[in-house]
């Protein structure tokens, strides 16, 4: 786990400098957090009067436990994680009923099933060990669906909990697992080194609401201004990132936060994450159709089995709408 601190100070206004509002954010490491890197480096958080402490999580269980314990205020996490824990289908339980919700989007799809070089077909994965973050959350259920529709029902392969994408990619490249689901752009380096893409969520299952902004409802109700400031900063950073005039500087920022990344890989990461059909969502707008895909998969594979309500049960875009009204 790596933690870094951004000290952001608001501009001089009147006879005194206002104190920044403190915010604790937990994210997954890697290029999927590029807008966060930009918001830090280019001062978008500072302009909103925020002092943001950012923690990179080793996995989804640590992240959700932390936000429920009050160690973190906001999480950038898959929409399905929020559904799982709200429905009692997650990897852990809490002393109080969870009040997690999603307040904005972040990333659509960009999920790949990456396999060892010697794996040519889905049938080759039978009886093999596959790496997952957690057994019942995140992208594991997507992998169940992908494998089953290609002839491999649950039970025809083994699963190993490994935590976030970075840990799983490491296990894959070390030969400890045969396959894993990877969030872009972290599939690029393995593919360059001969690992194969066996499946792609967007082409095989349709749009999928992946990374989303989430918090506890109780925290959001008592900190609406901080939440709206975060949303404005994130959206502004995303707009700056997508502007082609900022391509070179954006690449420099990427390399600063993810050291030793070759320029060619950063260019491929930009291509993957700024695709017209998937990647960073314009203005971080939540995608109901992508959420429906996630809910359909969870309804099929979630344990205990249950009917799930409409996506609106887990989402409140009020803070998002108010934030961008003032932008």
Residue ranges of predicted features:
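Pocket-lining segment of extracytoplasmic ligand-binding domains
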Residues: 80-81, 89-90, 166-259
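Short, glycine-/small- and polar/acidic-enriched structural segments
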Residues: 19-153, 159-163, 168-171, 178-184, ...
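Short, solvent-exposed loop/beta-turn-alpha elements that line the ligand-binding surface or hinge
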Residues: 47, 94, 203-206, 277-286
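Sec/Tat signal peptide C-region and signal peptidase I cleavage site
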Residues: 14-18
